[in-house]
Curated annotation (Swiss-Prot):
Binding partners and assembly: Heterodimer of an alpha and beta chain produced by autocleavage. This heterodimer may then dimerize in turn, giving rise to a heterotetramer.
Protein name: Isoaspartyl peptidase/L-asparaginase
Family, as annotated: Belongs to the Ntn-hydrolase family.
Cellular localisation: Cytoplasm
Ranges that cross the membrane: none
SUPFAM superfamilies in alphabetical order: N-terminal nucleophile aminohydrolases (Ntn hydrolases) (SSF56235)
Gene Ontology cellular component annotations, sorted alphabetically: cytoplasm; photoreceptor inner segment
Reactions mediated catalytically: L-asparagine + H2O = L-aspartate + NH4(+); Cleavage of a beta-linked Asp residue from the N-terminus of a polypeptide
Principal location class: cytoplasm
GO molecular function, one term: asparaginase activity
Length: 308
């Protein structure tokens, strides 16, 4: 089986030219990291974790060190990861003071009998596992402080159909052994209520992975994604014989018509077919397969280049 990794940097509204370049660099870097892990014989789980860590470490994206702020001006992050081989899953929500929530989600998957830990319980588990704690203010950027003030003035968190509230990072992968996995991570919605949890850590909404079907990671307005169970809905269409592109169009179209939700997704099937689709204005994405790197941000700017 030829390995593949696909990554996304979150659905978004119009993006400035200079920020597009920075996001392009970040998304390509993440795909290259994930694909490098696969080429060296790493697992799909290793690849999606590595790709998402690269995005969490990039302040251009709404995850990890780039996470947006809640109403109290603090960072609360959500993440989940799933192994399609045996449907193992790990998720965390409302976590603070750690650099890479996706690493903690994987520890939940591999080191506990549970699927999901939240808030103080997740923090206690992180400490027990030796995950380094960092001061919360180190995750707060000046850019996101200004963004919060603007959103408070406009009551942005209440604008559920507004593209500026879209943002997540994610990855899906298929490895040499035919195993699939997904990972998704986010800082959530700007000016969200303290303790708000979106789709990202909820398996079936923020992502899903099953070797019998494929893997998916979603992005967009979390409440809308939760309402339609976007990830599992898309894989259901694939189970029913739809192509990955048809399945993506059907599920995104349903979310838009049924609950007026905008978003995007990346999918890889068990046979290695893949797609990146979105109904928001833009979505940074990249895919690496067969020594080629495919990437884009807007619907009409897809490019292909050779991988190093």
């Amino acid at each position: 089986m030829n390995p593949i990794v696909v990554v996304h940097g979150g659905g978004a509204g119009p993006i400035s030219k200079d920020r597009k370049e920075r996001m392009h660099q970040g998304i390509v870097r993440a795909a290259t990291v994930g694909y490098g892990i696969l080429r060296e014989g790493g697992s799909a789980v290793d690849a999606v974790e590595g790709a998402v860590v690269a995005l969490e470490d990039d302040p251009e994206f709404n995850a990890g060190c780039g996470s947006v702020l809640n109403t109290d001006g603090e960072v609360e992050m959500d993440a989940s990861i799933m192994d399609g081989k045996d449907l193992s899953v790990g998720a965390v929500s409302a976590v603070r003071c750690i650099a890479n929530p996706i690493k903690l989600a994987r520890l939940v998957m591999e080191k506990t009998p549970h699927c999901f830990l939240t808030d103080q319980g997740a923090a206690q588990f992180a400490a027990a596992m030796g995950v380094p704690e960092i001061p919360g203010e180190k995750l707060v950027t000046e850019k996101n402080k200004k963004r919060l003030e603007k959103e408070k003035h406009e009551k942005g968190a209440q604008k559920t159909d507004c593209e500026k509230n879209l943002g997540t990072v994610g990855a899906v992968a298929l490895d040499f052994k035919g195993n699939v996995a997904y990972a998704t991570s986010t800082g959530g919605i700007v000016n969200k209520m303290v303790g708000r949890v979106g789709d990202t850590p909820c398996v079936g909404a923020g992502g899903y992975a099953d070797n019998d079907i494929g893997a998916i990671s979603t992005t967009g307005h979390g409440e809308s994604i939760l309402k339609v169970n976007l990830a599992r809905l898309t894989l259901f269409h694939i189970e029913q014989g739809k192509t990955v592109e048809e399945a993506a169009d059907l599920s995104l179209g349903y979310m838009k018509s049924r609950v007026k939700g905008l978003g995007g997704l990346i999918v890889v099937s068990k046979t290695g077919d893949w797609v990146a689709k979105w109904t928001s204005t833009s979505m940074p994405w990249a895919a690496a397969k067969d020594g080629k790197l495919h990437f884009g941000i807007d619907p009409d700017d897809t490019a292909i280049t050779d991988l190093p």
